[in-house]
Curated annotation (Swiss-Prot):
Part of the 30S ribosomal subunit. Contacts proteins S4 and S8. This is Small ribosomal subunit protein uS5. With S4 and S12 plays an important role in translational accuracy. Located at the back of the 30S subunit body where it stabilizes the conformation of the head with respect to the body. Keywords: Ribonucleoprotein, Ribosomal protein, RNA-binding, rRNA-binding.
């Protein structure tokens, strides 16, 4: 009785090896597509989140620091970040170049965001006052169509917060950073009428009366 020949010929070995190599290459390509696809989706989500925010540079100054070897020069950037829907922040960044300072300022501003209660006319609910150092900023609500009556860094903060009708007055220091931070303090102290009534333990009718 003859036994079947199970020995592989020299011509069969390269063909089997080539088939395995093709399968491995296809698996690598498929995995690469999945990874690349996931990376693109993640990048798109990140870009959409970043597109919600606007940043404006208020001031860029060249500053120096005295060290053991002499003076070390760098740049300081004051940046205001906001989404024009009630969130705004002021950041400061220092770096050896302007681009690096602005990038750090944007990151610092996003770490110090303030939620601003907006009315249906894109104004603020009540009058507010804020101080920072020698700067004193007074902001008050305005009627629809008034616009943003403010100047300098205060105007930038109010616009990026999404406030369309407001009156602001600067009292004291003219320093852009102090004024921007004073405006942030004033916005952070704002409360809606419901929150004010709850804190005082009274009804909304008593507030309006």
């Amino acid at each position: 009785m003859t036994q079947p020949n199970t020995q592989t010929t020299p011509n069969d070995v390269p063909a089997a090896a080539e088939g395995q190599q093709e399968q491995q290459q296809q698996q690598r390509r498929g995995g690469g597509r999945e990874r690349r696809g996931g990376g693109r989706r993640g990048d798109r989500r990140g870009q959409e989140r970043d597109s919600e925010w606007q940043e404006r540079v208020v001031q860029i100054r060249r500053v120096s620091k005295t060290v053991k070897g002499g003076k070390k020069m760098s740049f300081r950037a004051i940046v205001v970040v906001g989404n024009e829907r009630g969130q705004v922040g002021v950041g400061v960044g220092k770096a050896g170049d302007v681009i690096g300072a602005v990038r750090k300022g944007v990151a610092d501003g996003k770490k110090h965001l303030v939620k601003v209660p907006l009315t249906r006319h894109n104004s603020i609910p009540t009058l507010s006052n804020g101080r920072d150092g020698a700067a004193n900023v007074l902001i008050r609500p305005a009627a629809p169509g008034t616009g943003v009556i403010a100047g300098g860094s205060i105007r930038t903060v109010l616009e990026l917060a999404g406030i369309k009708n407001v009156l602001a007055k600067r009292l004291g220091s003219k320093t852009p950073l102090n004024n921007a931070r004073a405006a942030m303090v004033a916005l952070a102290s704002l409360r809606t009428h419901k929150e004010t009534a709850k804190e005082r333990g009274i009804s909304l009718e008593q507030i309006y009366s």
